[in-house]
């Protein structure tokens, strides 16, 4: 009872075909195909672009901080 039989699917398919018609479904599938092609083209272009080499880390010179005035007087 909970599963859909083949007759349920046939009725659903018939209703979809009646609502959308052959032309709209064809246009929809064409748009999906164009989207997939565009996505694949974008991914291929992304792979072709040379990766910018990472800049090597630079060492920051350490500067000694001057001692506070109170420590200078004690010495």
Curated annotation (Swiss-Prot):
Please list every transmembrane segment annotated in the UniProt record, as residue ranges: 1-21
Subcellular location per UniProt equals: Cell inner membrane
Sorted alphabetically, the keyword list is: Cell inner membrane, Cell membrane, Membrane, Protein transport, Translocation, Transmembrane, Transmembrane helix, Transport
KW Transmembrane helix (keyword) present: yes
Is-annotated flag, keyword Transmembrane?
A: yes
**Entry GO CC:** TAT protein transport complex
How does it sit in the bilayer? Answer: Single-pass membrane protein
Segments for region (Disordered): 43-75
Q: Which GO terms describe its biological process?
A: protein transport by the Tat complex
Pfam families, per this entry?
TatA_B_E (PF02416)
Tell me a Gene Ontology molecular-function term this record carries: protein transmembrane transporter activity
* NCBIfam families reported for this sequence: PRK00720.1 (NF001940), tatAE (TIGR01411)
Question: What's the subunit arrangement here?
Answer: The Tat system comprises two distinct complexes: a TatABC complex, containing multiple copies of TatA, TatB and TatC subunits, and a separate TatA complex, containing only TatA subunits. Substrates initially bind to the TatABC complex, which probably triggers association of the separate TatA complex to form the active translocon.
Q: What does this protein do?
A: Part of the twin-arginine translocation (Tat) system that transports large folded proteins containing a characteristic twin-arginine motif in their signal peptide across membranes. TatA could form the protein-conducting channel of the Tat system.
UniProt similarity note: Belongs to the TatA/E family.
Name of the featured protein = Sec-independent protein translocase protein TatA
What is the organism field in this record? Azorhizobium caulinodans (strain ATCC 43989 / DSM 5975 / JCM 20966 / LMG 6465 / NBRC 14845 / NCIMB 13405 / ORS 571)
């Amino acid at each position: 009872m909970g599963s859909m039989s083949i007759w349920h699917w046939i009725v659903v398919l018939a209703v979809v075909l009646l609502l959308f018609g052959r032309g709209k479904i064809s246009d929809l599938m064409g748009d999906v195909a164009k989207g997939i092609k565009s996505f694949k083209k974008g991914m291929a272009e992304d792979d072709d672009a040379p990766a910018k080499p990472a800049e090597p880390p630079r060492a920051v010179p350490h500067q000694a901080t001057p001692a506070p005035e109170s420590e200078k007087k004690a010495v």
